């Protein structure tokens, strides 16, 4: 009989096997072919259980291998470094919030429910949208859910997505719609401006099966889409839903999606008080305009205000018949354990920042990213491939292969941008990149290029 090397549960295993009428673990797993089973002890925990001291020592030895950068990373691609006020970490670390419990029971969850309602209210004001849910996993999953939602509403099968939208988000969408019969048609972008190609949009939208049209603002290259309202008009004309993906911080400078009547808005709250987390967990934003055909098809949880039997105001989850814990396979979405804790972090961050703080932060990011782009393009033969205005992220074209530049930056303990092509990279600059950090990046790249050209 199988015996676990150290967990003292052998009697319990025997009881469980007896209860289900099985004589051994081997019999329980006899459907698994013998040739793929491992019939030896695994070298887990160095072959023995480790003490707390030994575990801590092992982890610390691995941590020492980390490289401490001379400046904040200049890589973004949708997940960017920002300063997080200590109050954000403090509040979400409180035991009332720091839980995986879903507030199904409003009578014991008023604090958590009210905090989530505040998040929804703040995000709705920021986006100028009517209804915001309590969170999604991330931008990619929110976009995928928006595509599925559009298909449920109008039954159409084609979704237009820009080539200059985040490729990682598009990959998530393609994964989620597998087996649904939904087709993703990519719309080209203008190679000079970096913005959506309106002629190609008109061409691709000239069919009757358009379910939704998606546009990202700013787009993957950090460029503001100056014709976004025209895209919304095209969607209306085709009786398709418009989906806008937006960087929340950019709304300190530009018009919110609700002002130009977007149907669905998605995004990520990572830039509103969340760390990089090696790419996750993140915090998906999902909002719709006031239309019950949209609201009833929304994924995720929604917190609302009601009154109890004594007439007192209270908070509770609403429209729960949309959700999988009630309707199972007929639910609008299978998203269940969402990012409630991170939504509260967003609420704290937005409350702390306020309207003026949001505008000032957006301006700071705008000017710092433009300063970095200007200094980089002052290097001989370094240029920007796109001429349109940008925010936070921007593409730079180099005269030598970017891999060589990236390797040199790593030698100097600097993290460069994301490689877009052999000679082009996407850089990210936020409020944490001061003049010293930017100048260090520029001087290191200039030294590298000059050294190659003179050798």
Swiss-Prot record:
Catalytic activity: N(6)-[(R)-lipoyl]-L-lysyl-[glycine-cleavage complex H protein] + glycine + H(+) = N(6)-[(R)-S(8)-aminomethyldihydrolipoyl]-L-lysyl-[glycine-cleavage complex H protein] + CO2
Keywords: Oxidoreductase
Tagged with keyword Oxidoreductase: yes
GO MF, any single term: glycine dehydrogenase (decarboxylating) activity
GO BP of this protein: glycine decarboxylation via glycine cleavage system; nucleoside metabolic process
Subunit text: The glycine cleavage system is composed of four proteins: P, T, L and H. In this organism, the P 'protein' is a heterodimer of two subunits.
Name of the protein this chain belongs to: Probable glycine dehydrogenase (decarboxylating) subunit 1
Organism: Saccharolobus islandicus (strain L.S.2.15 / Lassen #1)
């Amino acid at each position: 009989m199988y015996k676990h090397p150290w967990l003292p549960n052998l009697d319990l295993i025997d009881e469980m096997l007896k209860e289900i009428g099985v004589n051994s673990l081997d019999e329980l797993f006899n459907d698994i072919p013998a040739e793929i089973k491992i019939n030896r002890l695994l070298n887990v925990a160095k072959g023995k259980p480790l003490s707390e001291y030994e575990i801590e020592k092992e982890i610390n030895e691995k941590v020492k291998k980390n490289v401490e950068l001379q400046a904040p990373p200049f890589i973004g691609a949708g997940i960017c470094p920002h300063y997080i006020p200590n109050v954000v970490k403090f509040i979400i670390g409180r035991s009332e919030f720091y839980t995986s419990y879903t507030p199904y029971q409003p009578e014991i969850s008023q604090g958590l429910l009210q905090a989530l309602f505040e998040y929804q209210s703040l995000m709705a004001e920021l986006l100028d949208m009517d209804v915001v849910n309590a969170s999604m996993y991330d931008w990619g999953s929110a976009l995928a859910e928006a595509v599925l939602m559009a298909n449920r509403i109008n039954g159409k099968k084609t979704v237009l997505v820009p080539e200059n939208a985040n490729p990682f988000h598009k990959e998530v969408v393609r994964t989620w719609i597998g087996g649904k019969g939904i087709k993703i048609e990519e719309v080209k972008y203008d190679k000079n401006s970096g913005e959506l190609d309106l002629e190609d949009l008109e061409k691709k939208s000239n069919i009757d099966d358009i379910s939704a049209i998606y546009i990202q603002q700013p787009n993957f290259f950090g460029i503001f889409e100056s014709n976004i309202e025209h895209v919304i008009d095209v969607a209306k004309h085709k009786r398709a839903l418009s989906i806008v993906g937006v960087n929340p911080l950019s709304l300190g400078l530009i018009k919110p999606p609700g002002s130009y009547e977007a149907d669905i808005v998605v995004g990520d709250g990572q830039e509103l008080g969340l760390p990089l987390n090696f790419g996750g967990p993140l915090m998906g934003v999902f909002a719709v305009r006031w239309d019950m055909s949209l609201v009833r098809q929304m994924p995720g949880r929604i917190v609302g205000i009601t009154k109890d039997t004594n007439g007192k105001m209270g908070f509770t989850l609403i429209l729960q018949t949309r959700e999988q814990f009630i309707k199972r396979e007929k639910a609008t979405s299978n998203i269940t354990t969402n990012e409630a804790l991170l939504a509260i972090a967003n609420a704290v961050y937005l409350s702390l920042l306020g309207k003026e703080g949001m505008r000032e932060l957006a301006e700071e990011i705008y000017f710092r990213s433009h300063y970095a782009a200007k200094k980089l393009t002052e290097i001989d033969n370094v240029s920007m491939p796109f001429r349109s205005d940008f925010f936070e992220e921007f593409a730079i074209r180099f005269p030598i292969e970017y891999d060589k530049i990236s390797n040199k930056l790593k030698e100097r303990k600097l993290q460069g941008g994301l490689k877009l092509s052999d000679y082009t990279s996407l850089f990210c600059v936020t409020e944490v990149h001061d003049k010293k950090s930017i100048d260090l990046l520029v001087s290191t790249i200039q030294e590298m290029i000059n050294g190659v050209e003179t050798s």
